[in-house]
Amino acid sequence: MNHLVKVLIVVVAIALVLCEAQVNFSPGWGTGKRSAVQDSPCKGSAESLMYIYKLVQNEAQKILECEKFSSN
C-alpha cells in the first residue's frame, strides 16, 4: 500500500506540473469585446458583391456547358 501511495503522489505531481490554468477570475472585466457593437470599415460594396455574383454565375454556366458536351 505504501508503494501505491508513492506512485499516486508522483502521478499527481506530474499532472500538476503539466497543467496550467487561471485560478482567479476578475468580475470587473465586464462583458468583453464580443458584446460591443462594431463599426467595421470592412463592408462589402454592392459593386464587389455583384462581381462575385456574376463570377459564380459564369462558372456555373461553364459547368453546365461541360456537362452538355460530356454527355454527348
From Swiss-Prot:
It comes from the Eukaryota. GO terms for molecular function: hormone activity. Expressed in corpora cardiaca. The modification Threonine amide is found at residue 31. InterPro entries: Adipokinetic_hormone_CS, AKH/RPCH_hormone. Pfam families: Adipokin_hormo. It is found in: Secreted. The modification Pyrrolidone carboxylic acid is found at residue 22. Keywords: Amidation, Cleavage on pair of basic residues, Hormone, Neuropeptide, Pyrrolidone carboxylic acid, Secreted, Signal. One of its GO terms (biological process) is neuropeptide signaling pathway. GO terms for cellular component: extracellular region. Residues 1-21 form the signal peptide. Hypertrehalosaemic factors are neuropeptides that elevate the level of trehalose in the hemolymph (trehalose is the major carbohydrate in the hemolymph of insects). Belongs to the AKH/HRTH/RPCH family. This is Hypertrehalosaemic prohormone. It comes from Blaberus discoidalis (Tropical cockroach).
